[in-house]
């Protein structure tokens, strides 16, 4: 009877303490440009896994659920049925994020979170070029506005964990004012003045730990803003009018000389 009670106590303790363990992986990325239609892919496959924290517990069925879109991924079990895995042959930045591993065991269900991390990358249809050959320092095409107009500067970055974004202007921290404000990670310049022209840089940073090593990842995106005079169109027009005037003067002068020469003859 005593032995039976001990066995019962052991089984109950095992079931109550049932938990899981799982993987933490990171995408290996060698570029920083991605878009919805052409997501950036990692250079290596990634296998996520999870298992009961009690090595004696076997798994009956298992699957992973991606938290971002609730997509269900059927897991494969190893021969001993003590580990569940799913392999992404060519993972993209859209696969980064949190996954819930759900295991069904003879002792009950286990739920555990696993993670795929991604450094910050640009995720946009905008055109970007590498700054001086640095793949994680990008430049966008410049924006030109007239004095008094408004301009909106976005920082279209993605990554997991979600990157922390800060802005600088001409390598100094961005100073907010009545004309320069922020909504989330977007900079809005209203009633632009000549002093608002310059290089606005979005700096996106995230940090994660894989296999005991903590990585802090940085992406810099430069956006140039040029503010021109609202009367700038007058200058080319003035040049054209002056040119026409000079041509008319030359033609009239030539005609006058021709007439004068003819009258002398």
Swiss-Prot record:
PROSITE patterns: IG_LIKE. Keywords: Cell membrane, Disulfide bond, Glycoprotein, Immunoglobulin domain, Membrane, Repeat, Signal, Transmembrane, Transmembrane helix. Pfam families: Ig_3. CDD domains: Ig (cd00096). Residues 41-108, 120-220 form the Ig-like C2-type domain. It is found in: Cell membrane. It comes from the Eukaryota. GO terms for cellular component: axon; plasma membrane. GO terms for molecular function: cell-cell adhesion mediator activity. Probably not involved in maintaining the position of ASI and ASH head neuron cell bodies and ventral nerve cord axons of PVQ, PVP, RMEV, AVK and HSN neurons. This is Zwei Ig domain protein zig-1. It comes from Caenorhabditis elegans. The lineage of its organism: Eukaryota, Metazoa, Ecdysozoa, Nematoda, Chromadorea. The gene is zig-1.
């Amino acid at each position: 009877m005593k032995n039976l009670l001990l066995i019962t106590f052991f089984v109950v303790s095992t079931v109550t303490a049932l938990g899981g363990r799982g993987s933490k992986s990171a995408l290996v990325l060698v570029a920083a440009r991605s878009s919805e239609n052409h997501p950036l892919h990692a250079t290596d496959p990634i296998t996520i896994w999870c298992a009961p924290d009690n090595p004696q517990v076997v798994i009956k069925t298992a699957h992973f659920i991606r938290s971002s879109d609730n997509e269900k991924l059927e897991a494969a079990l190893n021969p001993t049925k003590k580990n569940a895995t799913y392999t992404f042959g060519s993972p993209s930045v859209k696969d980064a994020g949190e996954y819930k591993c759900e295991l069904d065991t003879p002792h009950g269900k286990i739920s555990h979170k696993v993670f795929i991390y991604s450094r910050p990358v640009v995720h946009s249809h905008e055109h970007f070029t590498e700054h001086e050959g640095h793949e994680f320092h990008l430049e966008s095409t410049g924006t030109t506005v007239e004095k008094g107009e408004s301009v909106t500067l976005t920082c279209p970055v993605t990554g997991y964990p979600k990157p922390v974004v800060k802005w600088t202007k001409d390598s100094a921290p961005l100073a907010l004012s009545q004309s320069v404000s922020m909504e989330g990670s977007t900079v809005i310049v209203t009633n632009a003045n000549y002093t608002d022209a310059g290089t606005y840089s979005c700096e996106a940073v995230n940090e994660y730990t894989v296999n005991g090593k903590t990585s802090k990842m940085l992406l810099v995106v430069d956006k140039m803003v040029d503010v021109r005079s609202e009367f700038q169109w007058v200058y080319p027009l003035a040049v054209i009018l002056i040119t026409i005037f000079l041509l008319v003067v030359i033609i009239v002068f030539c005609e006058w000389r021709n007439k004068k020469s003819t009258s002398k003859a």
